[in-house]
């Protein structure tokens, strides 16, 4: 018995000693005699990933950053600290100057980096990383997501989708709707119509199936890379495969329709991908143009669905929340939107010029994105050693920038918790401080797409309804995008009814 007790004590001592050694070694503050930013690396393999996720689960993703800036950067909101995230040695940077450094030095000091779960969710037959895939996709963006003439084509489509979604009665009037869920459904309708010309009312089975898998994918796409049957990551990978397989079949059908003249090359992003070579005949070694195959088209359309859906749905959902909490802002938007409506004939669809008149509405939407940005931040990878604020950022380390480090910085946005659309009037906030879409050459190419969709929706919702929050203090969870814990239940009141009640 004494021998067993002694051996047990020695085993515990060995484990504690070994763990202490690993922690001390793993948290070494220097590299080749050069000073790394202060911080802590957490435990081997895990690092501080759990703390990173837990801050979002508590609805305060910014606390992970601000708490460590307070401890390791003496409260400097433009500082930095080292940590370990997603199994990688990382440095978290904060402030507009850091944003400018990263956004302005793509391929010079840094390159884009995605967690392993992203590479798995968006596979390429050419064995490209998610970063390389993103660069390839930018070949297609100008013709469909950036140029004004392309964007103008979307507005009537978005308007028509919005009117038809309202006609389903999903928005009320009602004593209770779960606004977050209805918003998710609406924005997926629009994405399927714009990117693949799939009409949710004409082909509800396809859209519903894609949407079910899509929600599973979103729940695990940014989770820890642990592929076991019960993990969110495992379920997300299965959902990714299901969506990509479905899109491949849609692409095969569209290819036949293009050959028969039943579809046209500029119809939507799907047709454009099928008809546009990624390598011209002149640049090809065999003198033949190279096109995307169906599998890679499935991956790229999936990426568009994620990007085109999540930003808009998140912004619209929290627009409801902040308008309910700030009725004076809602009334100012209502006045502006009624002025636009007064210029339209009955049934006439919105156009580009109409949306340009919605200036205050867009200021309010920007304030929504400041307080609840759809994207919390992103990673870069250092491709060479360089310094920032006097500290070494070593080659190969990951660098994380966060929207919250500037969006909630009181030195940039006084009273940062206050909802105030006037912050965006005139010249707006300083450069590199408002970054819901990132910045530099890696700025989200869907920024204008999201702007058009959200403004189109705002026009219809405020001219038809007022609303009240049923749970004013509902908890907000961020994982990885913000969402209300109880799906934002609202009482929807028709404008005519609200006038009668008044």
Curated annotation (Swiss-Prot):
Recorded E.C. number(s)?
Answer: 1.14.14.126, 1.14.14.-
Instruction: Tell me which CDD domains the record gives.
Output: CYP90-like
Q: How is it used?
A: Soapwort saponins possess anticancer properties and are also being explored as enhancers for endosomal escape in targeted tumor therapies. They may also serve as precursors for vaccine adjuvants.
The family database entries (Pfam families) matched by this protein are listed as: p450
Q: What does this protein do?
A: Component of the oleanane-type triterpene saponins (e.g. saponarioside A and saponarioside B) biosynthetic pathway, leading to the production of natural products with detergent properties used as traditional sources of soap.
Keyword terms: Glycoprotein, Heme, Iron, Membrane, Metal-binding, Monooxygenase, Oxidoreductase, Signal-anchor, Transmembrane, Transmembrane helix
**Binding site residues for heme:** 444
Q: Which family does it belong to?
A: Belongs to the cytochrome P450 family.
List the SUPFAM superfamilies hit by this protein, alphabetically. Cytochrome P450
Q: In which pathway does it act?
A: Secondary metabolite biosynthesis; terpenoid biosynthesis
Gene behind this protein:
CYP716A379
The cross-references to Gene3D superfamilies, in alphabetical order and at most eight, read: Cytochrome P450 (1.10.630.10)
Location relative to the cell: Membrane
Record-annotated membrane-spanning stretches: 3-23
Glycosites: 88, 181
Q: What is this protein called?
A: Beta-amyrin 28-monooxygenase CYP716A379
Under the heading InterPro entries, the entry gives:
Cyt_P450, Cyt_P450_CS, Cyt_P450_E_grp-I, Cyt_P450_sf
Q: What does the record give as cofactor? A: heme
């Amino acid at each position: 018995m004494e021998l067993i007790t002694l051996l047990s004590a020695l085993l515990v001592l060995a484990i504690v000693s070994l763990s202490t050694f690993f922690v001390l070694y793993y948290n070494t503050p220097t590299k080749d005699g050069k000073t790394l930013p202060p911080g802590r690396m957490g435990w081997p393999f895990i690092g501080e990933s759990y703390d990173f996720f837990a801050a979002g689960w508590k609805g305060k993703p910014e606390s992970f950053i601000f708490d460590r800036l307070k401890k390791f950067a003496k409260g400097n909101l433009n500082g930095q600290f080292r940590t370990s995230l997603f199994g990688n040695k990382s440095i978290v940077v904060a402030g507009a100057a850091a944003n400018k450094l990263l956004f302005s030095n793509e391929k010079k000091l840094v390159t884009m980096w995605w967690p392993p779960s992203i590479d798995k969710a968006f596979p390429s037959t050419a064995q490209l990383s998610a970063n390389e895939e993103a660069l390839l996709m930018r070949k297609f963006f100008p013709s469909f997501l950036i140029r004004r003439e392309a964007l103008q084509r979307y507005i009537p489509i978005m308007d028509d989708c919005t009117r038809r979604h309202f006609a389903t009665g999903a928005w009320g009037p009602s004593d209770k709707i779960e606004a977050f869920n209805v918003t998710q459904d609406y924005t997926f309708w629009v994405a399927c119509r714009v990117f693949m010309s799939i009409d949710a009312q004409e082909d509800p089975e396809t859209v519903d199936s894609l949407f079910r898998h899509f929600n599973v994918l979103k729940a695990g796409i940014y989770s820890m890379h642990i592929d076991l049957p019960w993990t969110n990551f495992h379920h997300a990978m299965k959902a990714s495969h299901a969506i990509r397989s479905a899109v491949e079949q849609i692409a095969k059908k569209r290819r036949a329709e293009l050959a028969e003249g039943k579809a046209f090359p500029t119809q939507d992003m799907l047709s454009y991908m099928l008809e546009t070579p990624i390598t011209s005949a002149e640049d090809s070694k065999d003198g033949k143009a190279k096109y995307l195959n169906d599998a890679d088209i499935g991956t790229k359309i999936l990426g568009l669905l994620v990007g085109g859906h999540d930003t808009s749905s998140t912004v619209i959902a929290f627009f409801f929340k902040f308008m309910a909490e700030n009725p004076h802002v809602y009334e100012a938007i209502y006045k502006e939107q009624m002025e636009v409506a007064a210029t339209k004939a009955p049934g006439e669809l919105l156009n580009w010029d109409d949306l340009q008149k919605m200036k205050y509405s867009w200021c309010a939407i920007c304030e929504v994105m400041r307080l609840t940005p759809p994207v919390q931040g992103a990673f870069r990878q250092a491709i060479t050693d360089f310094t920032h604020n006097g500290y070494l950022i070593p080659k190969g380390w990951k660098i994380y920038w966060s929207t919250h480090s500037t969006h909630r910085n009181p030195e940039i946005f006084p009273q940062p918790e206050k909802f105030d659309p006037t912050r965006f009037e005139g010249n707006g906030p300083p450069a590199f401080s408002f970054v819901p879409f990132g910045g530099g050459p890696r700025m989200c190419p869907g920024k204008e797409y999201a702007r058009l969709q959200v403004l189109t929706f705002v026009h219809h919702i405020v001219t038809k309804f007022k609303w009240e929050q049923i749970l004013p203090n509902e908890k907000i969870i961020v994982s990885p995008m913000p969402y209300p814990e109880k799906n934002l239940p609202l009482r929807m009141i028709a404008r005519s009814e609200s006038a009668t009640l008044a």
